[in-house]
Regions:
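Helix N-cap/coil-helix junction residues
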Residues: 30, 85, 177-178
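A metal-dependent, Asp-based hydrolase signature
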Residues: 50-93
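Active-site neighborhood of HAD-like aspartate-dependent phosphohydrolases
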Residues: 1-52, 198-199, 209
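Helical cap/lid subdomains and adjacent loops of hydrolase enzymes that gate the active-site channel
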Residues: 24-25, 38-40, 45, 60-64, ...
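Generic structural signal for small/hydrophobic residues in well-ordered secondary structure
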Residues: 8-11, 68, 114, 123, ...
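Short amphipathic alpha-helical segments and helix-helix/interface helices
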Residues: 22, 108-112, 123, 169, ...
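Asp-based, Mg2+/Mn2+-dependent phosphohydrolase catalytic module
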Residues: 1-7, 128-129, 134-240
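Substrate-recognition element of Asp-dependent hydrolases with the DxDx(T/V) motif
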Residues: 89-139
Length: 240
């Protein structure tokens, strides 16, 4: 019986615009290929590239930041060194955070409604400290509001692992003391959904993006509740 529902953040709850973020960073004079090519030091952390969004992965220094291997200050300063002269730390940080748009309230209302029905609700996200601080404070209004919606939050930067690495899913279910078949996982990445499904999770691929002015963004009026309710109903029926 499904008792636990695990949501991805970006592209599922949070509307994101990675192409716009890349554009803004380029406007600072950064060669994106050069940034992506910066190698990461050898550390005892996950080395499998993290999925940032459908079709986009973080490698090298970008991946290192996603899994908490480098501080925000060091990461932003690394980008700043690639900018044209005169670009400030604050300008780089602002450009980096432009991929995080907003979380429509209806999605949060639905998350809360599921929690009030007795489901344990969690977030599992490939994210970094700068993005999480921005999202937590601007979209949620602080940690207390995050706690209102979720029983716990699992972040790649804190776990030093990233989806689709099997180990991050295994660590989550070990921490929660649940079996994969008791969990429903919702993510916008094919690779992440396939990894979870292979381990036995019930899954939903939240693949409802659209292109607007050359940018791929999640539709703000979509919340995947029909798909969630269908799987929950089917699962309950099969267990009765």
């Amino acid at each position: 019986m499904i008792k636990t529902i695990i949501f991805d953040l970006g592209g599922v709850l949070l509307d994101i615009d990675l192409p716009y973020c890349i554009q803004r960073v380029k406007e600072l004079g950064v060669d994106i290929d050069a940034l992506s090519a910066i190698p990461a030091p050898e550390l005892a952390i996950d080395t499998k590239p993290a999925v940032m969004g459908e079709g986009m992965v973080a490698s090298g220094m970008l991946h290192l930041y996603q899994v908490g291997g480098i501080s925000t200050a060091d990461f932003i300063k690394t980008i700043q060194r690639l900018c044209r002269p005169g670009i400030s730390y604050e300008q780089v940080l602002e450009a980096w955070n432009t991929c995080c748009i907003d979380i429509p309230q209806r999605r949060l209302d639905n998350v809360l409604a599921l929690r009030q029905r007795g489901y344990r609700i969690y977030m599992l996200s490939n994210t970094n400290d700068a993005h999480w601080q921005d999202i937590k404070n601007r979209c949620f209004g602080g940690q207390d509001m995050v706690d209102k919606y979720f029983d716990n939050v699992f972040l790649s930067q804190e776990m030093q692992l990233a989806k689709p690495n099997d180990d991050i899913f295994l660590k989550v279910i070990e921490f929660l003391s649940v079996q994969p078949e008791e969990c429903l996982f919702i993510d916008d990445s094919t690779a992440n959904v396939e990894a979870a499904s292979y381990l036995g999770f019930h899954t939903i691929h939240a693949d409802v993006s659209t292109t607007k002015n050359g940018k791929v963004i999640a539709l703000p009026n979509v919340d995947w509740m029909d798909e969630i309710e269908e799987i929950l109903t089917q699962n309950a029926t099969s267990q009765s």
